[in-house]
């Protein structure tokens, strides 16, 4: 019996019991890698939850974006209501990295907006890893970035125990040392206040308040209290207060780091001057000396992460400490949608280094800034003790490394079989598809259509609209949250047909979609490769009448393999249903906007409308300016995501001017 306890209204069915048993046996035999090859809608998350329960190891579930991470976290919290299921993603609402564009001689400072709630969830994850074994952390790829040294984070924490005498002044100094600030008026996360014999602390990792009551110098009581009503929620005998930031540097380490930074600066200046890069040398000298002064005086400076190698005492090239280092030695990794996530792990390091190289070469940063980086792929896998890859279409690397430990999960608990596939010629494909669409609309079903080009998607959308079809076009400029809104509207029946160039979004749960149409299916490329075709066809695999139509004049190798694999699965599923007398049942799952509630949604004007509104800002009433600022911030975030730094800087400057106007400057 492990510490994990599943609460589920249903037992494993279909292929799930076999998959659970085989995965569990493989892990217990101490095999390092195994793959769950699970068709869409077969309940892979349920299977993984059962395996976690049986194995009982702290588990990291890695998803390739924060939206899917939130979905997985919600599902696992439902399965494990009495265990710690944590959520760990990047805490930036907006992040524009420091950058330099040599062509235009443009330097762009790092600007960021931290989401306090997500920061709290990150701290909650590391606290749980220190205090419990029954922990599941669902994370995005941000977990491979530096997070501070676990041992220093733990050693810096402040223990409290009822009945123990403490020096109250020293206790307050200790809280300040671990980045808590005193605020007797506004108590929040990362703050504390003192009223007589009562000390109240807002921990960085939860929204409850810790109240410590003293009798003289002795701790008389420790309680969790409601931050609004002050009502006691729980009484405790002891408690540990963890730092308000993950990066904690002891004073003696800070002094050594400053000396090391100064030594590196001296060597780098000599190097730049020898290359006759006098401007770069002057720039680096001025910036670094200012940072050193800030570090010595207040222990912090803007861009402090660029000195992380010195602050952590690492050797050049040594990998940073990450979330993985907060796990115990014996832990389990689950890589969701591994065919997307594994390549993402490989790609993070190279993209980070190319930007930093420019900053270093032009005197904005010391060479050691390159060691403030994500893990390299090989460094990441060296830290992994055991792993399950999960995908309907695992990549070749995952299949090779799993050897013969590839466990299939083909049968759906609902009895629904894989879609029936039809291949039709491209001649007259639009009118043929229109007829199919109208049939589905009459049955109140939904349709996904994928094209190869943006132009064709736009033309097809316009053609269908002219013929009375309620259709939407999903394009690349739509952000992740608005994308979820559109998909929810499709499920609710606000419109019936969704058209896009790349509707390949793994993990989409669209049980109302009964038809997937793939235009130009015989044009080989990423969007028409075998795995992409299987994933796209799988969007109709949750409907009892699911079908896929591939419009093509030739049968490509990718098409043949995708059709063969789908028909193989369909045959297995049909035979299972016949043997067990199962009638496929439709999935009844109400549309949920839980993710939208978690991640703030803001309606956005397009860029041209925003430019016009900004130009007319002098004529706007003051009460309308905050809304314009909100819209500009949204565009700034989008530009930064696309690495359009100059565009993002333009929006940043406009926001500053509007805020000055609000303040009457």
UniProtKB/Swiss-Prot annotation:
Pfam families: Helicase_C, ResIII, UVR, UvrB, UvrB_inter. InterPro entries: Helicase/UvrB_N, Helicase_ATP-bd, Helicase_C-like, P-loop_NTPase, UVR_dom, UVR_dom_sf, UvrB, UvrB_inter. Residues 25-178 form the Helicase ATP-binding domain. One of its GO terms (cellular component) is excinuclease repair complex. GO terms for molecular function: ATP binding; ATP hydrolysis activity; DNA binding; excinuclease ABC activity; helicase activity. The UvrABC repair system catalyzes the recognition and processing of DNA lesions. A damage recognition complex composed of 2 UvrA and 2 UvrB subunits scans DNA for abnormalities. Upon binding of the UvrA(2)B(2) complex to a putative damaged site, the DNA wraps around one UvrB monomer. DNA wrap is dependent on ATP binding by UvrB and probably causes local melting of the DNA helix, facilitating insertion of UvrB beta-hairpin between the DNA strands. Then UvrB probes one DNA strand for the presence of a lesion. The beta-hairpin motif is involved in DNA binding. PANTHER family: UVRABC SYSTEM PROTEIN B (PTHR24029:SF0). This is UvrABC system protein B. It comes from Cyanothece sp. (strain PCC 7425 / ATCC 29141). The lineage of its organism: Bacteria, Bacillati, Cyanobacteriota, Cyanophyceae, Gomontiellales.
